[in-house]
Amino acid sequence: MSIEVSNESGYDVSEPELISVARFVIEKMDVHPAAELSMVLLDSAAMADLHMRWMDLPGPTDVMSFPMDELEPGGRPDAPEPGPAMLGDIVLCPEFAEQQAAKAGHSLGHELALLTVHGVLHLLGYDHAEPDEEKEMFALQRQLLEEWVADQVEAYHADRQSEKDRRLLDKSRYFDEP
């Protein structure tokens, strides 16, 4: 799986964290492991330009998704197996997201992770134009974000335990050579 991030926003964000959450969602949604995704982080002016050009709406927004390939389960009928697909581009605006994060009472990192999940789901065909679609998409978005956070917490604790074990073993005389 290839996930590229281009940060043109001027904000210092954790690109590895964005890649981690995108990869987690793509894997959880059973997308082919050779799928490709591009993420671009823009400043408010550039995002406002995209928002007007593609959605005919003024001002910046938090996230926009641009699907690349038409996704078909299993690929072509005559294909031996599904091949890699370019899912598309997710465009994030950290400046706009920072304002939303402040209103919601959480960090910019949390908001960008949420928006990344949202963007990937759009690339996979989910939408929230209708109330039923919104309910389904937002519930899945919340579930995936919670699972990713739990996965990150578990990995953090495992790393800390490994470090404690290593320090303990380093102090032990049991493993010294005779």
UniProtKB/Swiss-Prot annotation:
Protein keywords? Cytoplasm, Endonuclease, Hydrolase, Metal-binding, Nuclease, Ribosome biogenesis, rRNA processing, Zinc
Enzyme's top EC category? hydrolase
> How is the cofactor bound here?
Binds 1 zinc ion.
The places in or outside the cell where this protein is found are: Cytoplasm
The UniProt entry lists the main location of this chain as: cytoplasm
Record: residues binding Zn(2+):
118, 122, 128
Cofactor(s) listed: Zn(2+)
Identify this protein by name.
Answer: Endoribonuclease YbeY
**What species is given as this protein's source?**
Mycolicibacterium smegmatis (strain ATCC 700084 / mc(2)155)
Lineage here is:
Bacteria, Bacillati, Actinomycetota, Actinomycetes, Mycobacteriales
Q: Which gene encodes it?
A: ybeY
